[in-house]
From Swiss-Prot:
<comment type="similarity">
    <text>Belongs to the bacterial ribosomal protein bL32 family.</text>
</comment>
<dbReference type="InterPro" id="IPR002677">
    <property type="entry name" value="Ribosomal_bL32"/>
</dbReference>
<feature type="compositionally biased region" description="Polar residues">
    <location>
        <begin position="23"/>
        <end position="34"/>
    </location>
</feature>
<dbReference type="GO" id="GO:0006412">
    <property type="term" value="P:translation"/>
</dbReference>
<keyword id="KW-0687">Ribonucleoprotein</keyword>
<keyword id="KW-0689">Ribosomal protein</keyword>
<dbReference type="GO" id="GO:0003735">
    <property type="term" value="F:structural constituent of ribosome"/>
</dbReference>
<feature type="region of interest" description="Disordered">
    <location>
        <begin position="1"/>
        <end position="59"/>
    </location>
</feature>
<protein>
    <recommendedName>
        <fullName>Large ribosomal subunit protein bL32</fullName>
    </recommendedName>
</protein>
<dbReference type="GO" id="GO:0015934">
    <property type="term" value="C:large ribosomal subunit"/>
</dbReference>
<dbReference type="Pfam" id="PF01783">
    <property type="entry name" value="Ribosomal_L32p"/>
</dbReference>
<feature type="compositionally biased region" description="Basic residues">
    <location>
        <begin position="49"/>
        <end position="59"/>
    </location>
</feature>
<dbReference type="InterPro" id="IPR011332">
    <property type="entry name" value="Ribosomal_zn-bd"/>
</dbReference>
<dbReference type="InterPro" id="IPR044957">
    <property type="entry name" value="Ribosomal_bL32_bact"/>
</dbReference>
Length: 59
């Protein structure tokens, strides 16, 4: 098993963890219905960029 030679400083630990944060999902509002959905995904009622592309949950 590998054992570290010297202890890492809090600064180096923070530098390593600097890319570990999570980003919030980007949201869009549908033009016709005003419903909020994830970007580049269809909304729950089946609309994408103002067009009906599939049957939604309510249909």
């Amino acid at each position: 098993m590998a054992v570290q030679q010297n202890r890492k400083t809090p600064s180096k630990r923070g530098m390593r963890r600097s890319h570990d944060s999570l980003s919030k999902p980007t949201l869009s509002t549908e033009q016709n219905t005003g419903e909020t959905h994830r970007r580049h995904h269809i909304s729950a009622d089946g609309y994408y960029r103002g067009r009906k592309v599939t049957r939604g949950q309510d249909d």
